[in-house]
Amino acid sequence: MLVILRMAAHQTEVPISLENGLRSAVEERWREASKAAGKGASVHDMQAVDVDLVEQESRLLGGALRLVVDALPDGGRALVVGHSPTNEAAVLGLTGQVIGPMGKGEGVLIVEEEGGYTVGSLGVT
């Protein structure tokens, strides 16, 4: 699968790295908050259920996502693969922006410019 993704991105020579900080140590707590918030709940909805979880995890996951972004060369891109809602929490922690729940195969484009971040959608075709 990684070979296919690298070929599709035309980045066969770019190394694949693992950022362990993007893995939550409290996955079960995320599942509980998601279930309590209801089907299709956003990170914002889960925050109403477990404010400490979302605030602390967003900070941790956002910091890990910042490490990925900071390691990129100018014009570089990274593909971060993981589970919802922790990806959404990482985006919140990095950018301060709440995004809606992402389905399988969905993602966002985060652009860093002069120390600030913008979040855009990625078209799925």
PLM feature segments, named:
Residues 38-72:
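Internal catalytic-core helix/loop-beta-alpha segment
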Residues 54, 58, 79-80, 99:
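Aromatic-acidic/polar surface patches that form glycan- and anion
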Residues 73-82, 86:
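Beta-strand elements within well-structured catalytic alpha/beta cores of enzymes
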